[in-house]
Amino acid sequence: MNYPHPIIAREGWPFIAIAAVIALLIHAVGGFGFAWPFWLLLVFVVQFFRDPQRPIPAQPNAVLCPADGRIVAVETAQDPYANREALKISVFMNVFNVHSQRSPVDGAISKVEYFPGAFLNAAIDKASTENERNAVVIQTASGKTVTAVQIAGLVARRILCYVRAGEPLSRGQRYGFIRFGSRVDVYLPLGSRAKVSIGEKVYASSTILAELEQ
């Protein structure tokens, strides 16, 4: 499947343009000696907004990672968005990770809920319940419920979500973006088998987070 998005995310184009104009102006006035920190900033902004295509595993019961980052939680927890006990797997994204979010499963969206909140360090546990967040609840064709929650972080102050309740989602489909360091929590039915461990580096779409019970 072709990835229908530019390799540099559209969300970053205004920031890249501003950084490029500033670097060019300072270079023109003061030369490279004054401008090099601004060129370095431009490189950072470009790499932050990269959005590469990723291979998508074919296993039908696989739950794919929704974001690049590092696993900070694998535990049984309450899923407040679907009112159930669930297997919770959390991915923390630092400022050097790709920050687009992609659907972990095929299914239909039953609910999208936004919650205002704080901007605590997204790596800590209470960020899941206290930070600004946006939950997307997905029902698979087999009746399983999968919840993916975008969570703002200490620096990230803007959650973008491009889907609505009632719409279909395909595994690996890009559905959102969080700027500048953040977290995604995934809640799965009890009985799902986690395929990752705390501290593991993971990649959106290509890493299998868990397998749903068949």
Curated annotation (Swiss-Prot):
Query: What membrane topology term does the record carry?
Result: Peripheral membrane protein
Q: Name one GO molecular function term.
A: phosphatidylserine decarboxylase activity
The pathway it acts in is: Phospholipid metabolism; phosphatidylethanolamine biosynthesis; phosphatidylethanolamine from CDP-diacylglycerol: step 2/2
Give the co-factor note.
Binds 1 pyruvoyl group covalently per subunit.
Task: Please list the cofactors this protein needs.
Answer: pyruvate
Q: Give the top-rank taxon of the lineage listed in the UniProt record for this protein.
A: Bacteria
Residues modified as Pyruvic acid (Ser) are S182
Active-site residue numbers: S182
Task: Write the signal peptide boundaries.
Answer: none
InterPro entries per record: PS_Dcarbxylase, PSD-A
In the UniProt record, the gene name given for this protein reads: psd
What are the subcellular locations of this protein?
Cell membrane
The record, for HAMAP family, names: PS_decarb_PSD_A
Q: Which family does it belong to?
A: Belongs to the phosphatidylserine decarboxylase family. PSD-A subfamily.
Question: Can you state the subunit structure given in the record?
Answer: Heterodimer of a large membrane-associated beta subunit and a small pyruvoyl-containing alpha subunit.
Q: What is this protein called?
A: Phosphatidylserine decarboxylase proenzyme
Keywords assigned: Cell membrane, Decarboxylase, Lipid biosynthesis, Lipid metabolism, Lyase, Membrane, Phospholipid biosynthesis, Phospholipid metabolism, Pyruvate, Zymogen
Catalyses: a 1,2-diacyl-sn-glycero-3-phospho-L-serine + H(+) = a 1,2-diacyl-sn-glycero-3-phosphoethanolamine + CO2
Which GO CC annotations does the UniProt entry carry?
A: plasma membrane
Task: Write out the GO biological process terms.
Answer: phosphatidylethanolamine biosynthetic process
Query: Lineage of this protein's species?
Result: Bacteria, Pseudomonadati, Pseudomonadota, Betaproteobacteria, Burkholderiales
Q: What is its EC number?
A: 4.1.1.65
Role summary? Catalyzes the formation of phosphatidylethanolamine (PtdEtn) from phosphatidylserine (PtdSer).
Principal cellular location given in the protein's record: membrane
Q: Where is this site: Cleavage (non-hydrolytic)?
A: G181, S182
| PTM annotation, UniProt | Is synthesized initially as an inactive proenzyme. Formation of the active enzyme involves a self-maturation process in which the active site pyruvoyl group is generated from an internal serine residue via an autocatalytic post-translational modification. Two non-identical subunits are generated from the proenzyme in this reaction, and the pyruvate is formed at the N-terminus of the alpha chain, which is derived from the carboxyl end of the proenzyme.
